[in-house]
Amino acid sequence: MSPEQSAESVSHISTNTPIAPAVNTWRYYLDDQGKSPHTIKAFVADVLMLASYLPPDRPLGDVSTHEINNFLDWMQKNRGVPCSPKTLSRRITSIKSFFRWLHQYGVILVDPAERVVQQSVI
């Protein structure tokens, strides 16, 4: 997909769009980028998990770095389901990728995930 086609594909998404509908468009972008079906499934599930953590229908433009960090903290300490360091690292990558894509195509002015610290797995 050319940059022009990618920009056109996000033209229906705005700062007021909730995360879930935007994720559906992002899924096609990931596929066009040659990501494997397993990667796409995991990345989409990770971002949808963030969406389910946030207030219902939270607009993309209202998501903050603080909320993303709270989500990741909850993921590690309060979710009640173990989250391995490798899984946590992938979830951070997924969220960063999603918001970077939105920022790259002008949907959001500020990328709230840019300042989220990537946790490496050794």
Each language-model region and where it sits:
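A detector for short, charged/polar N-terminal pre-domain segments
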Residues: V10-A20
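N-terminal core-binding DNA-recognition domain of tyrosine recombinases/integrases
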Residues: E4-A7, N24-H38, V44-I122
